[in-house]
Every structure is written in C-alpha cells, then in structure tokens.
C-alpha cells in the first residue's frame, strides 16, 4: 500500500514539475514579448514572431501562453491585410493555435478574447455577408471573457473597438462605444497581469480610441 501511495505521489510530483515553466522558456518568451510592439507595425515581422512563439509552444508542449501569443500575433496580421482573400487562411491558422492554448487552459478569459478576434477577422472578409454568421460568435466570446474574469479589461476594449467601427445606422459609433471603452480604461488602471509573461496589451489603443471619441 505504501508503495502504491509513493508511486502515485511521485507521478503527481513529476506532472507538477513538467507543468512548470523552465528558465529557458521564460527567457525565450520575454525576448519575444520585448519585440512585439516593434513587430506589430509590420505584418511580415508579426508573422515571423508568431512562428517563433509557435516553435516555443511545440518545444514546451504544456505552456498555453506560447500558443496564445502565436495565435495573437497571427490574428493581428489578419487585421493588417489589404486583400481580404487571404484573411480566412490567417484566421484558420490563428484558430488552430488558440484552440491548442484552450486545450491547455480551458475557460480562460484571455483565450476567449483571441477567439473573438479570430471571428472578427473572418467577418471582415465580407461584413455584410458574414455578420449573421460571425457576429454572434464574436459577442459570445467577449461576454464569456467578461464572465470568466471580471477584472480583465480586454473584452471591454475589443467590444468598444468593434462598436466604434460599426456604422451608426447599425447601432455603432462613438456614442455606443464610449461606455465599453471607459469601462476598459477603468479596469486597465487597476489591472495587474498574473506574471510578466501574461497578457497586458490594449491600454494604449483604448486611450487612442477614447481620444478619437471626444
């Protein structure tokens, strides 16, 4: 009986150790995160960064943040596309990556935010034709993100930006976006990421959108 208990304890201990991020992983992630702002100005650089995060994810296998950032970089290249014909391919890749993150960290507010972003890229291929299909998916993921973590400012930011970019005749514009953006700003003011590797993006964009809505 003691041997069985010892073996079970050993297995649990080994699983715990394997789930912990190692120093090499942390250093690689921090290096990539430090280049994200610069890379975000150029689709090719952002795609290269997505590939770097994916390589980290494949090497580590148990760290959801590497898959998360790979998906985040990938989906943001979709928003930068001039030709909508390639946006579905980008969304497919981002979706696969964020689903891998979801399998490692289910019911995660940050992951739901990126899922909403992926659905937004799909909708932007042809908003008039695709809104009925992807609009509810965007909304569902953003509302889920709010429920999963009430302190997370990003679902409010993403909702506000979506509303700002929606024509007024369809219920959008600054008048409806401002409430979401102001809530996002309030939450950003007190938000503290769980670690230096956890998501902490969006504040600068919220400030810019609020300034545009004055």
Predicted ranges, named:
Residues 1-25:
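Bacterial Sec-dependent N-terminal signal peptides
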Residues 21-36, 59-81, 107-126, 151-166, ...:
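Amphipathic alpha-helical repeat scaffolds of TPR domains
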Residues 39-52, 86-97, 131-139, 178-185:
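Helix-turn-helix repeat elements of alpha-solenoid scaffolds
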Residues 56, 101, 144-145, 184:
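Canonical positions in the second alpha-helix
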Residues 88-138:
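Hydrophobic, well-structured mid-protein blocks that either form specific transmembrane helices
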Residues 117-183:
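A charged, solvent-exposed segment within the mature domains of Sec-exported extracytoplasmic proteins
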Residues 172-179, 183-214:
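Terminal, low-structured helical/coil segments at or just beyond the last alpha-helical repeat
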């Amino acid at each position: 009986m003691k041997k069985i208990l010892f073996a079970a304890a050993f297995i649990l201990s080994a699983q715990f150790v394997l789930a912990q991020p190692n120093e090499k992983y942390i250093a690689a992630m921090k290096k990539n995160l430090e280049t994200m702002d610069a890379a975000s100005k150029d689709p090719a650089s952002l795609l290269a960064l997505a590939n770097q995060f994916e390589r980290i994810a494949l090497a580590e296998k148990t760290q959801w943040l590497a898959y998360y950032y790979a998906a985040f970089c990938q989906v943001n290249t979709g928003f930068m596309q001039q030709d909508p014909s390639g946006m579905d391919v980008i969304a497919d890749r981002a979706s696969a990556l964020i689903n891998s993150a979801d399998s490692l960290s289910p019911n995660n507010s940050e992951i739901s935010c990126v899922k909403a972003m992926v659905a937004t890229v799909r909708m932007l291929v042809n908003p008039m034709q695709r809104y009925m299909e992807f609009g509810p998916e965007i909304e569902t993921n953003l509302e889920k993100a709010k429920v999963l973590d009430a302190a997370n400012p990003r679902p409010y930011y993403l909702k506000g930006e979506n509303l700002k970019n929606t024509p007024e005749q369809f219920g959008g514009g600054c008048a409806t976006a401002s409430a979401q953006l102001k809530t996002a700003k309030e939450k950003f003011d007190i938000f503290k990421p769980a670690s230096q590797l956890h998501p902490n993006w969006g504040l600068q964009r919220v400030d810019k959108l609020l300034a545009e809505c004055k």
